[in-house]
Amino acid sequence: MTKPNHELSPALIVLMSIATGLAVASNYYAQPLLDTIARNFSLSASSAGFIVTAAQLGYAAGLLFLVPLGDMFERRRLIVSMTLLAAGGMLITASSQSLAMMILGTALTGLFSVVAQILVPLAATLASPDKRGKVVGTIMSGLLLGILLARTVAGLLANLGGWRTVFWVASVLMALMALALWRGLPQMKSETHLNYPQLLGSVFSMFISDKILRTRALLGCLTFANFSILWTSMAFLLAAPPFNYSDGVIGLFGLAGAAGALGARPAGGFADKGKSHHTTTFGLLLLLLSWLAIWFGHTSVLALIIGILVLDLTVQGVHITNQTVIYRIHPDARNRLTAGYMTSYFIGGAAGSLISASAWQHGGWAGVCLAGATIALVNLLVWWRGFHRQEAAN
């Protein structure tokens, strides 16, 4: 990519952070509404959980097949077009009269909301090398805040006008954001000479040849699976006795997650200073311990909030560290690196949603916590038994 004469100003960083959060939020508005949507369409818990899975599978497909286009086409035009198409997907969801139609709209929204993952490497490219980790951390905080605050906003809007109102409003906001991005982003022309099949092939080539990318992608996959296991079934827990919370109250729990996400921002700075292996080890240990507090959440709201704070802090911290590390590998191929890493990341999220819904249906909250703790332990063992030693040496 040709780097333009365009400063990465604080205002532009804020715009890109908001755009990233708004785009990815479109995949998560449904989570606190699952109980309501399930009753609307007469669905079981596991069937309702597939709505979230469809969004994440659509997102994973977009990561693999659309994000590499950021290394091929002019980025501003690509970003604005995908933002408008994501808005169109939410219009389908808002007007759906069947589960099949809702899944179609959700999948299309997920497919094009990967625009968030074109904005992240764009910010990394515009940032100076000594501030790259910090900038990526800020943009990624916007992304995770979007995921978490989506639940709060969705719950409040659903209380005011029903669950469909959430998607009507979100669609309008995405259209307005497309206009703001058109006005605010610099133009960046591609310098790659690869065609589309070669771009996709290079993603797989990087996976085959680069141990660090494979390691970080696996860590991201397992970490985000943990995140999805918690948030997919939490609406069912909080809507049932002894809590019996409304959609609006359930959505407010996203604020606890948002606080945890903000607390992880320094992880990018630590990675800039060469301490990525320390933040990864510490984060994965805390991730495992967070499930103890989450388990007590079936009777204690305070324990659940503490668990949410710790889990979201560690998920975001490890994620920021992962991206800061992989962006050092091939500076001219950051969109393709993002495609490979984030495809693994959201495949983990989709798998976590399915595991969570099934665990809830068959084992209740104890089953959900057991599934989450098991995957957290596997993640820690994968890192501890060799990966972190090689990366620290590198």
Curated annotation (Swiss-Prot):
Disulfide bond is among the record's keywords: no
Molecular function GO terms recorded: transmembrane transporter activity
Alphabetized PROSITE patterns for the sequence: MFS (PS50850)
One GO CC term, this protein: plasma membrane
TM region(s), chain numbering: 10-30, 50-70, 79-99, 100-120, 138-158, 166-186, 218-238, 243-263, 291-311, 337-357, 364-384
Membrane topology: Multi-pass membrane protein
Family stated for the protein in its record: Belongs to the major facilitator superfamily.
Protein name: Putative uncharacterized transporter YgaY
Organism from which the protein derives: Escherichia coli (strain K12)
